[in-house]
């Protein structure tokens, strides 16, 4: 389904009336397995000569970091909630509907190589930053090592840049120097190449998840979701009660990636005066191994919350159609869900005026939000939206393993119905109409109560009409009618005997004819699915 969604979204973006540059496909190529960049990292700048003492310090740093004993698969792990008790099934009356709420235990396991960036921590995120690979990195609060730095090489993947124009050497890799270098690369492209590539299509990354718990969504989208949800305000309470269905979508439009050279040895990322003892004093050890931000994606990040109070099982399909722009004109149920749903968007980047935007609207307006920022230019500047980290020990990718258990809540609405009786026959008739009403005890077990119409077995002369109103939890409906023939050997004759009928909005039972030739019909208006 996600692949289909990605195709639909791509079609939306390429349908914009913009000139397509010659090499747009190179700029918009996207490798799903490696969000940040698929290009090779730049080569390291030449090492400057070291004094014997500096070489000794460098060798000691290399030996210490390369000797750290840790399992890279267990360093960065997020453990979410553990579910021990699953609440029982329950039902309740809500207006003209009976709602049945069911809960199931579910789990999610997600490996994330990319870490999402939100505005609160963007100042900590820059290519080449040295960080500790520990729980703070998992929590998206990277602990940057405050040490002197050596030079490093940055490269950018904007199209057309030749003759090493896409690379720059930062001699002293501080945060400000690196950010200035990134700005220099972007401005270089704007001045020399932007005219030849007027509309660089953003690379798209799309992911979605129906919402049930905050822990589940953190495992799905990373701990940055905590900050995002301060604005999205996912209504977990209403979701848990079965009164609302909500979906969260992460939609990235990546304009360019900035990559960092892989160091040939760990000490190449440190200034000449840095010692092993300084790193140890800063807490660098096997529990907090050093890592570096190897690549940063710049662009526009949109988080969406889609909301509806529908109990339909087609809500996910309706949301997918709204996001992709797929027509649902032939499906009344999907059309009604979209019409009666809303969205909230939190947007980072893509605007020269506001870095963060919060927008509320109807699903019909959603495509306009996704179309904006589809291309990179001076008017749609990119901000850091995601980054990857590598272990300094061996340049291996540092992957965050997220897992959580959660309760999936589903609800189904059963609409009230009625039986309309019409007796126009030339005889005395008696009816017997019964049904079962289903409820649930505190443990979630079904409680079945048998119900009978108050006019059962009472003689009715033509013309007689009546309506029997049935609640949404009515099941196993039985309709029986007999007529008096006046014959001594067959005083009563069955006219209709229909059993175990489903609940419908309007069931019309008609009987007519004579004592010897009675007739009946059982028809349905607007059946309830």
Swiss-Prot record:
Keywords: Cytolysis, Hemolysis, Host cell membrane, Host membrane, Lipid-binding, Membrane, Secreted, Signal, Toxin, Transmembrane, Transmembrane beta strand, Virulence. It holds the Pfam family Thiol_cytolys_C. The keyword Transmembrane applies. Activity of listeriolysin O is regulated on multiple levels. It should be high in the phagosome, thereby allowing escape of the bacteria from the phagosomal compartment. Then, once inside the host cytosol, the activity must be controlled to prevent lysis of the host plasma membrane and loss of the intracellular environment. Gene3D superfamilies: 3.30.1040.20, Perfringolysin (3.40.30.40), Perfringolysin, domain 4 (2.60.40.1430), Thiol-activated cytolysin superfamily/Thiol-activated cytolysin, alpha-beta domain (3.90.840.10). Homooligomeric pore complex of 35 to 50 subunits; when inserted in the host membrane. This is Listeriolysin O. A motif (Conserved undecapeptide) lies at residues 483-493.
């Amino acid at each position: 389904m996600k692949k289909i969604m990605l195709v639909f979204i791509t079609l939306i973006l390429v349908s914009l009336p913009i000139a397509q540059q010659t090499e747009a496909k190179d700029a918009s190529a996207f490798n799903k397995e490696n969000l940040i960049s698929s290009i090779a990292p730049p080569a390291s700048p030449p090492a400057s000569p070291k004094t014997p003492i500096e070489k000794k310090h460098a060798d000691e740093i290399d030996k210490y970091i390369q000797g750290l004993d840790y399992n890279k698969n267990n360093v960065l792990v997020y453990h979410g909630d553990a579910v021990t008790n699953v609440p029982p099934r329950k039902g309740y009356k809500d207006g003209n509907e009976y709602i049945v709420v069911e809960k199931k235990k579910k789990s999610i396991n997600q490996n994330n190589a990319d870490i999402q960036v939100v505005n609160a921590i963007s100042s900590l995120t820059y290519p080449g930053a040295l960080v500790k690979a520990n729980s703070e990195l998992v929590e998206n609060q990277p602990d940057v090592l405050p040490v002197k730095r050596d030079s490093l090489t940055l490269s950018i993947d904007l199209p057309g840049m030749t003759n090493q124009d896409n690379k720059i050497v930062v001699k002293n890799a501080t945060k400000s120097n690196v950010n200035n270098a990134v700005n220099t690369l972007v401005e270089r492209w704007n001045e020399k190449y932007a005219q030849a590539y007027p509309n660089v299509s953003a690379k798209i990354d799309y992911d979605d998840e129906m919402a049930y718990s905050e822990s589940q969504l953190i495992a799905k989208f990373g701990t940055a979701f905590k900050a995002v949800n301060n604005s999205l305000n996912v209504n977990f309470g209403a979701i848990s009660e079965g009164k609302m269905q909500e979906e969260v979508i992460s939609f990235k439009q990546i304009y360019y990636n900035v990559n960092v050279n892989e160091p040939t040895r760990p000490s190449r990322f440190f200034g000449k005066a840095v010692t092993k003892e300084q790193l140890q004093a800063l807490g660098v050890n096997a529990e907090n191994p050093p890592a570096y931000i190897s690549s940063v994606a710049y662009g526009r990040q949109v988080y969406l919350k889609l909301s509806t109070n529908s109990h339909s099982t087609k809500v996910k399909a309706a949301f997918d159609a709204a996001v992709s722009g797929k027509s649902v004109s032939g499906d009344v149920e999907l059309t009604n869900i979209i019409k009666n749903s809303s969205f909230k968007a939190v947007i980072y980047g893509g605007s020269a005026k506001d870095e963060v935007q919060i927008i509320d609207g109807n699903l019909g307006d959603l495509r306009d939000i996704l179309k904006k920022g589809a291309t990179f230019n001076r008017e749609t500047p990119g901000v850091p939206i995601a980054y990857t980290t590598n272990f300094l020990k061996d340049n291996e990718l540092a992957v965050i393993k997220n897992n959580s258990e959660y309760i999936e809540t589903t609800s189904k609405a059963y609409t009230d119905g009625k039986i309309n009786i019409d007796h126009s026959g030339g005889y005395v008739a008696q009816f017997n109409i019964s049904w079962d009403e289903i409820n649930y005890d505190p443990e979630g077990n079904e409680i079945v109560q048998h119900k009978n119409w108050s006019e059962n077995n009472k003689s009715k002369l033509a013309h007689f009409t009546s309506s029997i109103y049935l609640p949404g939890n009515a099941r196993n409906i039985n309709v029986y009618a007999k007529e008096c023939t006046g014959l001594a050997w067959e005083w009563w004759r069955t006219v209709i005997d229909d059993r175990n009928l489903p609940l419908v909005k309007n069931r019309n039972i008609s009987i007519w004819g004579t004592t010897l030739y009675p007739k009946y019909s059982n028809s349905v208006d607007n059946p309830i699915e």
